[in-house]
Amino acid sequence: MQPALLDTSVYITALRAGSDALGTLRRLAPQAPLWLSAVVLEELYAGISRRDRRVVERLERDFERAQRILVPNLNDWSQAGQVLARLAAEYDYEEIGRGRLTNDARIAMSAGRQGIVVITANQRDFAKIARFRNFRFELTAV
């Protein structure tokens, strides 16, 4: 079974749904080894409420113990920049448009390198990135 990671959009939806929602996320990839992107972790910490902080801390601890935290390497950063430049040219993005896609590009580059499928609710951005970098993503409505 191909490994998977959940995008920030999936975790945020689950956190908003309530305390038990994170436990049900496993059903999105029941047989797949799950990974946590360091980029997703950063986004979660940056945007969570005090109430949800312990949930995210537990996620970090559990994935770190399992040695399944995916950290972008130098090549991922370089490829993300190249993809963002191509997206800017293709879609006439200004700096804000590119900035919005930066984290998603790093997630896509690192997941693609490791053969990990990204499970997301954000079709718009990941579909654009996929035009310029081969990686797998699947949509979910959570």
Describe these PLM feature segments.
Residues 10-11, 40, 76, 107, ...:
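Alpha-helix capping/helix-boundary segments
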Residues 1-36, 40, 46-64:
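Short, well-structured N-terminal submotif of metal-dependent ribonuclease cores
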Residues 51-55, 87-88, 136-139:
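Short, hinge-like loop/turn segments at secondary-structure boundaries
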Residues 35, 70, 138-140:
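General small-molecule cofactor/ligand-binding pocket signal
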Residues 69-117, 121:
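Active-site neighborhoods of divalent-metal-dependent phosphate/nucleic-acid chemistry enzymes
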